[in-house]
Amino acid sequence: MSTTTTTRAEYGASGTSYYTTTEKQDSYPSLENILEKHCKNDTLKACIRELLDGCADITEALRSALVTVEGTDNSFGDKQLSVDVIADNIMWDLVKSSPTIAYGASEEEPVMVKCSGSDYTVCWDPLDGSSIVDNNWAVGTIVGVWPKHTGTGEDGMLGATGRDQVCSLVALYGPRTTVIITLDDGVYEFSYGCTPEGCQLPDGSFEPWICSKIKVQIKEDSKIFSPANMRAAQDTPGYKKLLDYYMDNRYTLRYTGGLVPDVYQQFTKHMGVFTNPTSKTSPAKLRLAFEAAPFGALVEAAGGKTSDGVTGGSILDVTIKEVDQRCALAIGSANEVKRFNEMIMAK
């Protein structure tokens, strides 16, 4: 267990906190050590290294860039922020120069672009959390990696599902930069920029990336909830009933409005549920290929569960029919996603 519960009844549900009990190790495995043991495909190893280099570059850029409005709109008509453009440019530079990536698409401009590499189709959200980044809150990068031969088209995307991914990766940029990745046998977390005072490799040396968590697991039950799209509760009675259940049963609210921090916490607290149903007046906003499928692969690899919010089935089984396809989503601890299905869809 890496978290503990402290309850102060006089403060009500908000007085229930989940603190880490993770103790500092004398040394930590290197990125190369973990990849060598837990990623058999050499081409995929190279792709992961490239993606982590991109996350490192975005980290450094966020530390120095001001958050300002650019003079451009993205494909959805939203004003782009300086940090959105910087992060997306870093990802495009990486993807277009990669020997492993054959096709790429960004959430900022959801059109598949042919690249010069060999094996993979990569979709990414360069900086998830644009609406909260000006607050200096945690934001992130989401990446899904598909073989280029999946699906029905030459780019490997249309006709594919999230279950076809060979790797997914989410970076969280907060006081520290950490990245969770699906490898052959589970989910691993890597931390960036460790110092001699922080952590070191077994041989006493220091590298940009060390493995800070091995084979992360998400428990079946949770007392933490992250309710997105609460407007949907106005015309979705089941969602209002679910929110009332959380409050009546003294669940702890942990919600920032950013998909990355709100779901990533499930890998540090080892529990949680993120709910984002849709309704006629509150339509789907999450993007299947850029957000839901990559996170779904990570959560299910860690023992969690997902729901597509329509059939109650896994988000990983939804066929990608459009690059910019939107979807509902419930994701997290298995029994909590089951509760979502039961209350929202009577499944």
Segments (PLM) and residue ranges:
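IMPase-like, lithium-sensitive Mg2+-dependent phosphomonoesterase catalytic core
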Residues: 2-69, 79, 85-347
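Short, surface-exposed loop/turn segments at secondary-structure junctions
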Residues: 73-77
